[in-house]
Each structure stands twice: as C-alpha cells, then as structure tokens.
C-alpha cells in the first residue's frame, strides 16, 4: 500500500508530459545527456598522467626576439 505501482508512475508520466510538452522534455533529455557526456570526458582528461601534460608545454629557450612598436611611459601612470 505504501509503494507506487507501475500504473501510478504511468499516470505521473502522462501528467508531466501534458504539463511540459514532449518537445520540452526531449530538449531536457538531450541537454542532460550532453552534460553527462561532457562530465565523463572531463573525468577521462583528469585521469591522464602528469607526464603527458608536461609534454604539451612549449619549450622555454629564455630569449625572445621581438621589436617594440611604441615605447612605454616610465612615469608609473599605466592607464
């Protein structure tokens, strides 16, 4: 008596479909599925070893060869 039967759940599902509409429920399902997929991909990226992450860094040579386009003021007023 305390538990809900399959008929109770079908009636609740029918009422929810009537209130929100099937198009909105389909959009919610699609958004939820995309969020779960993104979460799983994020967890896989977090599991990569630290050695692989370090290989993606750019090498640092120490010297950079560039030409300045304009001279910066030395008055301390950097607006």
From Swiss-Prot:
UniProt keyword annotation of Transport present: yes
Main localization of the protein described in the UniProt heading: membrane
Cellular component GO terms held in the UniProt record: TAT protein transport complex
Domain of life of the source: Bacteria
Keywords: Cell inner membrane, Cell membrane, Membrane, Protein transport, Translocation, Transmembrane, Transmembrane helix, Transport
Residues that span the membrane, as ranges: 1-21
Protein localization: Cell inner membrane
Biased composition (Basic and acidic residues): 66-79
InterPro entries listed in its UniProt record: TatA/B/E, TatA/E
GO molecular function: protein transmembrane transporter activity
Gene3D superfamilies from the UniProt entry: 1.20.5.3310
Region feature Disordered, mapped onto this chain: 43-79
GO biological process assignments: protein transport by the Tat complex
Membrane topology: Single-pass membrane protein
NCBIfam families noted in UniProt: PRK02958.1, tatAE
UniProt function note: Part of the twin-arginine translocation (Tat) system that transports large folded proteins containing a characteristic twin-arginine motif in their signal peptide across membranes. TatA could form the protein-conducting channel of the Tat system.
Self-association and partners: The Tat system comprises two distinct complexes: a TatABC complex, containing multiple copies of TatA, TatB and TatC subunits, and a separate TatA complex, containing only TatA subunits. Substrates initially bind to the TatABC complex, which probably triggers association of the separate TatA complex to form the active translocon.
Family label: Belongs to the TatA/E family.
Protein name stated in the entry: Sec-independent protein translocase protein TatA
Species in which this protein is naturally found: Paraburkholderia xenovorans (strain LB400)
């Amino acid at each position: 008596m305390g538990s809900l039967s399959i008929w109770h759940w079908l009636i609740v599902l029918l009422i929810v479909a009537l209130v929100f509409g099937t198009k909105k429920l389909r959009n919610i399902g699609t958004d939820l599925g995309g969020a779960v997929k993104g979460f799983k991909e994020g967890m896989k990226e977090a599991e990569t070893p630290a050695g692989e992450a370090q290989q993606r860094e750019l090498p640092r040579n120490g010297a950079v060869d560039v030409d300045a386009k304009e001279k910066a003021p030395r008055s301390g007023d950097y607006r």
